[in-house]
């Protein structure tokens, strides 16, 4: 019985310690190196919470943009020299008194991304017009998933882009 308890305690200890994500596992980090319209385009970084979790951690970058403007924002990765990305776009709308997401193209949400030198993302915001927005428009969203290697590990960082026809104060 004692051997069984020791074995169970050892197994439980190994499982708990191996499931802890350490903070030193660095995500992809970015610095805003250019912003042609800082009054209407802002970027914020909210690091993941420090502590133990059973879920994978992802860093969180949020970009807010007013829909009626255009401009460019450049984000340069500070801890990886070779990044790739994918882009997914959608609209938030009200339909039948319920909020819904509908898929959209880059052109429809007015967001396009280019990887300029393998470590810099140039995000272009096109000016949107009311007549081009879907009925019940609440906002446009783009998710940029950025992939790279940090410390020999494959990592992903999400950059969420929100566009609204309500002007947000830049912080």
Which residues make up each language-model segment?
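Bacterial Sec-dependent N-terminal signal peptides
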Residues: 15-40
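Sec-dependent bacterial lipoprotein signal peptides
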Residues: 1-18
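First exposed extracellular module after export/assembly in secreted or surface-exposed proteins
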Residues: 34-171
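A ubiquitous, low-specificity "background" feature that marks scattered single residues
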Residues: 8-9, 19-23, 102, 121
């Amino acid at each position: 019985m004692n051997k069984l308890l020791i074995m169970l305690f050892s197994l439980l200890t190994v499982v708990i310690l191996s499931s802890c994500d350490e903070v030193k596992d660095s995500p992809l980090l970015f610095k805003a190196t250019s912003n042609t319209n800082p009054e209407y385009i802002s970027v914020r970084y909210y690091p993941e919470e420090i502590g133990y979790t059973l879920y994978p951690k992802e860093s969180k970058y949020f970009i807010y943009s007013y829909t009626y403007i255009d401009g460019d924002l450049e984000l340069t990765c500070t801890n990886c020299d070779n990044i790739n990305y994918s882009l997914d776009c959608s609209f938030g709308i009200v339909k039948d008194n319920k909020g819904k997401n509908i898929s959209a193209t880059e052109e429809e949400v007015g967001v396009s991304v280019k990887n300029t030198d393998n470590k810099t993302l140039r995000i272009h915001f096109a000016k949107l017009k009311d007549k081009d927005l879907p009925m019940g428009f609440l906002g446009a969203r783009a998710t940029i998933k950025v992939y790279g290697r940090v410390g020999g590990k494959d990592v992903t960082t999400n950059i969420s882009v929100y566009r609204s026809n309500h002007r947000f104060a830049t912080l």
